[in-house]
Amino acid sequence: MKLLHIDSSILGDASASRQLSAELVQAWRQNEDGLDVTYRDLAADAVAHFSALTLAAGSTPAELRDAALKHEVAVGEEVLEEFLAADVVVIGAPMYNFTISSQLKAWIDRIAVAGKTFRYTENGPVGLAGDKKVVIVSTAGGVHAGQPTGAAHEGYLRTVLGFFGITDIEVVRAEGLAYGEEPRTQAIAAARRQIAGQFAAA
């Protein structure tokens, strides 16, 4: 089994999403012999945002691409191939200003590729990546799950993953992390129980 582990927090070792996503992946390793893990840190090694250069790279014949266009194509292909190869994707997704980090959005823009993760038909879009399981490690300073303020965070991720055809989506959630030390401790403990319960039921 191949697992793709994505982190997107800018907080380094102080990040709850990084801590919990690492614990989730470690638990998976302990319960899945031969697990092949690919790790991508979108804060430390950011994927360039979708731009005019991206469009130019895709529309320019390979033999006519300069160094910048070749690099743009290589980055997009590498990110997409990692995603397509994975059986499981673990996404560390902290909330910043009511949505996901710009680094995570840049990654999503690179895997949203017509003919690879979705296609359009006369009856509408069809997802092409539905054979995956995705676990979103969702963290937030406030409490937003199930509310309008969370629509551009967990809601957005569910929407775009669903657009890719993915229906097996789970959320490990720790929110209210900015409400004080005790609420933070309780929220992280609850997320850890979710992680433990996921494998206890397996």
Swiss-Prot record:
Cofactor(s), by name: FMN
Binding residues annotated for FMN, in chain numbering: S9, S15, A16, S17, M95, Y96, N97, F98, T139, A140, G141, G142
E.C. number: 1.6.5.-, 1.7.1.17
Keyword terms of this UniProt record: Flavoprotein, FMN, NAD, Oxidoreductase
Record text on cofactor binding: Binds 1 FMN per subunit.
InterPro entries named in the record: Flavodoxin_fold, Flavoprotein-like_sf, FMN-dep_NADH:Q_OxRdtase_AzoR1, NADH:quinone_OxRdtase_FMN_depd
Domain of life: Bacteria
Reactions mediated catalytically: 2 a quinone + NADH + H(+) = 2 a 1,4-benzosemiquinone + NAD(+); N,N-dimethyl-1,4-phenylenediamine + anthranilate + 2 NAD(+) = 2-(4-dimethylaminophenyl)diazenylbenzoate + 2 NADH + 2 H(+)
Presence of the UniProt keyword Flavoprotein in the record: yes
Family: Belongs to the azoreductase type 1 family.
Assembly behavior: Homodimer.
Role this protein plays: Quinone reductase that provides resistance to thiol-specific stress caused by electrophilic quinones. Reduces both benzoquinones and naphthoquinones efficiently.
Note: Rate of quinone reduction is higher than reduction of azo substrates, suggesting the enzyme is better suited for carrying out quinone rather than azo reduction.
HAMAP family: Azoreductase_type1
Protein name (Swiss-Prot/TrEMBL): FMN-dependent NADH:quinone oxidoreductase 2
Organism: Pseudomonas aeruginosa (strain ATCC 15692 / DSM 22644 / CIP 104116 / JCM 14847 / LMG 12228 / 1C / PRS 101 / PAO1)
